[in-house]
């Protein structure tokens, strides 16, 4: 006899354990599971737990060489999704020993690796993760965090203002630098490389870095304010990425940028460590996120990608606007904005938060609202996101009829007016338009911007909404 019973047995016999009491050190996951017809939810939930931890499709004799009870993932609860006839939320607990310390890459390889192609499931979505303090403590997290960034920039009591330079591709380095100067001179705190600006034939990275550094130092001297431009260090190799970050540091600029999903978590974490060691802020763009998070029944919810970024490291991340051209429902967006900024967030299913999360003082990340926003949105953005945010107007700055600098002036005046009104106790949600109109009486730049964008709306319902 070989000493073990060969063959295939149902996952639920080993991996479905409704009596399990979760531990403080477990990583907890909430999966939205859509089983194939005829597959019971317990078997589907157990299959997810098995395939994302120790299981394989058949019994193997090497199972006897380890303690499966110590290492296996466990599906400990299953809930039916309200309003859906074949969807369930399966809760899975993973022992901490399954994961390498300080590695988002390894965590995701286990939890969202092969299991998403599993035949017994029609669809699978990771809705949320609870990262235990014991695991959080193995990560550096954001290079600096919100308070250190404010201290570096000497900017307090208001959201920060940014602008993505457009057209995103095709400008020469000198013309690009000119646009950066005009926007910063007009009153913005930051300008930004677009996510797909790396080092193309029309504008090599080194030329762009030099002209942008010249632009921001000139604007800094003339305004007396600290300025920044997000220099995109994303590259084809990690070595090249770090080389670009080193050059940015040598120029003396305050901030660089990375596309964390296309660049990858390993590269991102390396860059975040470099940025902390060398005093650079790190702006994160989420290019490719909607491929992963847009579908309601399959993929990974952005709140999980946001948590992963806070662990991997970044001082800013794009988070949707609620009011602009890109996807984002208000309660869901504010749920993951709190997960980015706050030290402790309570479970709140009305905002899509499945687990209480304690970040044990890991630095916070500034959410960046960007995409199809303009001066009329300023009161809503100020009210929704509060002071600890970056409001980024690309077309809403560069599309101003009088040019880039007046576009920047219009946005700065609108922001200052909204912050002043809020501090005086006015209701931005109700009086927003009136506040902007009042401010435009003494700012011709704002008046012109108000006229151009008064009719622009993006009336599409969000795809990713809460279960009712």
Swiss-Prot record:
Keyword annotations from UniProtKB, A to Z: Calvin cycle, Carbon dioxide fixation, Chloroplast, Disulfide bond, Lyase, Magnesium, Metal-binding, Methylation, Monooxygenase, Oxidoreductase, Photorespiration, Photosynthesis, Plastid
Residue numbers of N6,N6,N6-trimethyllysine PTMs: 5
Residue stretches in coiled coil: none
CDD domains named among the record's database cross-references: RuBisCO_large_I
Binding site for substrate: 114, 164, 168, 286, 318, 370
Keyword Magnesium: yes
Main localization category: plastid
Pfam families registered for this protein in UniProt: RuBisCO_large, RuBisCO_large_N
Residues recorded as bearing N6-carboxylysine in the entry: 192
Post-translational modification note: The disulfide bond which can form in the large chain dimeric partners within the hexadecamer appears to be associated with oxidative stress and protein turnover.
GO cellular component, one term: chloroplast
EC supergroup of this enzyme: lyase
GO molecular function, one term: ribulose-bisphosphate carboxylase activity
Cofactor binding annotation: Binds 1 Mg(2+) ion per subunit.
Signal peptide: none
Entry EC no(s): 4.1.1.39
Gene3D superfamilies noted in UniProt: Ribulose bisphosphate carboxylase, large subunit, C-terminal domain (3.20.20.110), RuBisCO large subunit, N-terminal domain (3.30.70.150)
Protein family (similarity comment): Belongs to the RuBisCO large chain family. Type I subfamily.
PANTHER family, per the entry: RIBULOSE BISPHOSPHATE CARBOXYLASE, RIBULOSE BISPHOSPHATE CARBOXYLASE LARGE CHAIN
Remaining remarks: The basic functional RuBisCO is composed of a large chain homodimer in a 'head-to-tail' conformation. In form I RuBisCO this homodimer is arranged in a barrel-like tetramer with the small subunits forming a tetrameric 'cap' on each end of the 'barrel'.
Protein name according to UniProt: Ribulose bisphosphate carboxylase large chain
Gene coding for it: rbcL
